[in-house]
Amino acid sequence: MSELKIRDPRDIILAPVVSEKSYGLLDQNTYTFVVKPTANKTEIKIAIEQIFGVKVTSVNTMNRKGKVRRTRTGVGKRPDTKRAIVTVAEGDRIDIFTGPVA
């Protein structure tokens, strides 16, 4: 049998996505994270459960292409990113956006 290579969960989950759309999904127990592009759904689920101590019910991922930007010296490209939309079980919450509201 093949062995699942366990990586450090903090290397898989890079940052939460802070946007209006991600704030709107908080009421549905759905959170959005920027993840390592090589991570799969199983690794993302295990990492979220280990870091935040919640039960994950589903993981959806999307690959986003980096935009091409022109500069004075030529053309550059922003890096490609991968996002994970994670739904946690009813009653579980992840407090990543807590703090004073401006």
Swiss-Prot record:
Keywords: Ribonucleoprotein, Ribosomal protein, RNA-binding, rRNA-binding
Single GO molecular function: rRNA binding
Record GO biological process: translation
Pfam families (alphabetical): Ribosomal_L23
Record's function text: One of the early assembly proteins it binds 23S rRNA. One of the proteins that surrounds the polypeptide exit tunnel on the outside of the ribosome. Forms the main docking site for trigger factor binding to the ribosome.
HAMAP family from the UniProt entry: Ribosomal_uL23_B (MF_01369_B)
Family listed: Belongs to the universal ribosomal protein uL23 family.
Matching NCBIfam families: PRK05738.1-3, PRK05738.2-4, PRK05738.2-5
Subunit structure: Part of the 50S ribosomal subunit. Contacts protein L29, and trigger factor when it is bound to the ribosome.
Protein's UniProt name: Large ribosomal subunit protein uL23
Organism: Cutibacterium acnes (strain DSM 16379 / KPA171202)
Gene name in the database record: rplW
